[in-house]
Every structure is written in structure tokens, then in C-alpha cells.
């Protein structure tokens, strides 16, 4: 007659295995689609992405001093070590924070943002005073790369402008451990390039002026004389600190920074962000190994910074939602 074998005693500590903190989405390395050949109305070829930008949107409550920005750097030391990413703060500890004033303008029904456009003005400050010219930033941000590239954001101005086309990597909206991609087709230029009293002075701006400067916005115009207003009646103060350099190997290095947005005057903290980006000329020359390290580091950092992260948010969306009635963005 067979003898029954008593089951081995189990430890309460071993009853629930610790889940592995791995990626929950397929790797995006090598999966960003190639653009189909196309051209703008003037015959110029469509723009191609030249930046990869990784962003974590953060709760702002842990950032209350310049030193607290560097405290966030301690959070990703382990993810960096795990994936062979070098992180150094040499030369950054002494650098001051950077201050910018940022405001957004839109129609009363958020027609720009609902159609994936963002229009803002920003002014840098130093020692409490504005420096340089106010800058206009106009962008089309969307998850469809081809649509983003074919949207001609170039302004109709006499002065020069600069285009920045970015692949933006963000966490998933609903859980940690994944990556979703947005494509941001930007143009920026000094306000003086379009004359005095246009964009950035929200009470002087209407849709007609906006369409003259940005012809692509004719698609959102309903009628002449429509007014543009300051979004959420709020002017933002951005406080940004470069905290170090990340080295992913194979020549792929970039600055890392932490920033918070708060309301001007009340200094009410709204949202934070950790970001790093690098520029490239030819995507085929980017090291796949370095990109995989970038991705693995970004995934691990999400888990390490769990107490900081604000899933499903962007800085712009936070401003638009300040007074309720959130728009239907494409983000």
C-alpha cells in the first residue's frame, strides 16, 4: 500500500511570488514607421523626425526646492546601473534653475487643441527679469506619424523660424511598464517676426490673424472675427533644472532635466516632468543597442519612480483642464 507523502511546509513569505517588473508593450526600437514620400503645397518635401524625447509626467508635490530636483536623480541610479547607463551630475550641481513664463491661447471651444494643435508663447527669465525676445511655439502633436509629418506647421512670416520634429515616448495612460508614442511637429520663432500686437497678447489676437500666420489653421476656422483667449485664464511659470548627463553608449548621450509648472502669482504647483532627448540626422545610423538601453532604462525608471509618476497626463492637458470642461485632445 503506497505511503502518503506529507507536503513540504511553505513559508508565508513565499506564498505570493513577487511579480517581475518587465515591459508590458512590445519594443518600439525599429518599429517607428517609415514615412511615405510626400510634399507640401510649395513642393518642399515633408519634414522627418530628428529628435527622440522620453518623458515622465510627475506629481509636483515632491518638488519644493532646487535640491529636490536633484533628489529625483537618485531615483534612477538603480535603473541606470541595471541597464549599463552612465549618469553623471558633474558640472550641474552649481547650475541655477531656469525660469520661463508660458501661456497658451485657443478658441473658447478649444478648437486648436481638439484638432491636435498647440499654440503658446514663452519668455525666459534671469535673476527675476525677462531676457531675450518672447518666443512663439506652434505644434501639431498626434499618434499618427504620417499625418503629423504632412501637417505643414511652417509660419507665413518674414523672419526665420526653426522646425523641431520629435518622436515622444511616454508611459501608458493606465499602467506602468509600457511605452506609447506621440509625434510632435513643432515650429518656433521670435514674436517680432510677425509684428507687434499679434500672438502672445491674447486680447489682440483673433482667428483671422492666426490663419494669416499659420495657414494650416484655416482648417479650424469657422467664421471671421472669432476671438482667441488665454487658456484657463492662467499664465504658467516653468521652473526647470538640468540635473546631469545620461550616456547610453555608442555615442548616444543627452542632458536630463526635471521641471515643474506652477501658476504665476499664487505659485500653485500643477505638474512636473522628467525628460531627456537626443537629436539625430539619420535614423538608420542610430545604434539599436543604445536605443534598447534607452528603452529598458525608461521602463525600469517608471517602476522606480512610481511614487512620482502621474499617468495619463501631459503638461499641456493639465493647463487645459484647470477650469474643468476638458477638451477632447488627440494625446
Regions found by a protein language model. Give the residues of each.
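Phosphate-end processing signature that detects enzymes handling 5′-triphosphorylated RNA
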Residues: 2-331
Amino acid at each position: 500500500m503506497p505511503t502518503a507523502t506529507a507536503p513540504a511546509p511553505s513559508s508565508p513569505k513565499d506564498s505570493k511570488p513577487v511579480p517581475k517588473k518587465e515591459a508590458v508593450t512590445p519594443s518600439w526600437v525599429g518599429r517607428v514607421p517609415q514615412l511615405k514620400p510626400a510634399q507640401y503645397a510649395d513642393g518642399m518635401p515633408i519634414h522627418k523626425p530628428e529628435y527622440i524625447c522620453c518623458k515622465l509626467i510627475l506629481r509636483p508635490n515632491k518638488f519644493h526646492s532646487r535640491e529636490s530636483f536633484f533628489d529625483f536623480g537618485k531615483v534612477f541610479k538603480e535603473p541606470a546601473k541595471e541597464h549599463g547607463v552612465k549618469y553623471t551630475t558633474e558640472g550641474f550641481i552649481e547650475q541655477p534653475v531656469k525660469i520661463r513664463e508660458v501661456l497658451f491661447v485657443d478658441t473658447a471651444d478649444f478648437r486648436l487643441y481638439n484638432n491636435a494643435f498647440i499654440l503658446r508663447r514663452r519668455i525666459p527669465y534671469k535673476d527675476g527679469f525677462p531676457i531675450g525676445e518672447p518666443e512663439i511655439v506652434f505644434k501639431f502633436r498626434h499618434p499618427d506619424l504620417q499625418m503629423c509629418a504632412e501637417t505643414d506647421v511652417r509660419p507665413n512670416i518674414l523672419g526665420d523660424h526653426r522646425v523641431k520634429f520629435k518622436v515622444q515616448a511616454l508611459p501608458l495612460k493606465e499602467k506602468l511598464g509600457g511605452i506609447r508614442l506621440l509625434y510632435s511637429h513643432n515650429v518656433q520663432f521670435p514674436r517680432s517676426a510677425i509684428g507687434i500686437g499679434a500672438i502672445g497678447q491674447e486680447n489682440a489676437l483673433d482667428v483671422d490673424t492666426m490663419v494669416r500666420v499659420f495657414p494650416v489653421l484655416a482648417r479650424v476656422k469657422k467664421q471671421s472675427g472669432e476671438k482667441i483667449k488665454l487658456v484657463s485664464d492662467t499664465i504658467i511659470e516653468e521652473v526647470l533644472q538640468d540635473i546631469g548627463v545620461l550616456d547610453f553608449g555608442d555615442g548616444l548621450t543627452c542632458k536630463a532635466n526635471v521641471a515643474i509648472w506652477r501658476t504665476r502669482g499664487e505659485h500653485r504647483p500643477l505638474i512636473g516632468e522628467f525628460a531627456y532627448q537626443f537629436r539625430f540626422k539619420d535614423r538608420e545610423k542610430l545604434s539599436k543597442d543604445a536605443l534598447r538601453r534607452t528603452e529598458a532604462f525608461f521602463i525600469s525608471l517608471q517602476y522606480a519612480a512610481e511614487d512620482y509618476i502621474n499617468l495619463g497626463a501631459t503638461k499641456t492637458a493639465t493647463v487645459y483642464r484647470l477650469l474643468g470642461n476638458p477638451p477632447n485632445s488627440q494625446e
